[in-house]
Amino acid sequence: MSQVTGFDQSNVAQYSSFDPLGSLEHAGSNLGNFIQRNNPFPSLSQSASHTFDDVRSDSGKIFDELKSEADKFYDDAKHGLSDIDYRDFYASDPGNTVLRASMQSPYLNSYMDINNAPNVIPLQAPPIVTNRNSKDYNILFVVVILLLLFVAWRCYVNKR
């Protein structure tokens, strides 16, 4: 039986009223129309709609005001930083010269001539300690080389 009884010759009329995309596209409007037709409280829905619109517009205004305030604060801060005269931090009067020299000195804020031995009192001199850093780095280097040799050996053993 090549043709189903009750359908057209090409057997496609059964799908003529089935439009899933169209029904999805119109679902929202159909629901809105249904609610408007059967709504027992039309004034309530209108006031709720107006209230929602008012809240949305007010929140938009508040957001815009906050954004403009933040932009203004950022611009003020940026211009305030750019208006700083950094030459004030490098003044050449004796007090600032002494202060700057003492801040850059490793000898406990001494601004005396440290190349002259009588000027260096023991509290201003850095502690004398033996230098063990080179030994530590030599050991670290040996450990790393041994680790690399071990990894290479394990890779070689696993490939055999």
UniProtKB/Swiss-Prot annotation:
The chain crosses the membrane at residues 137-157. It comes from Acanthamoeba polyphaga mimivirus (APMV). Its main location: host cell. It is a single-pass membrane protein. Keywords: Host membrane, Membrane, Transmembrane, Transmembrane helix, Virion. It is found in: Host membrane; Virion. GO terms for cellular component: host cell membrane; membrane; virion component. This is Uncharacterized protein R557.
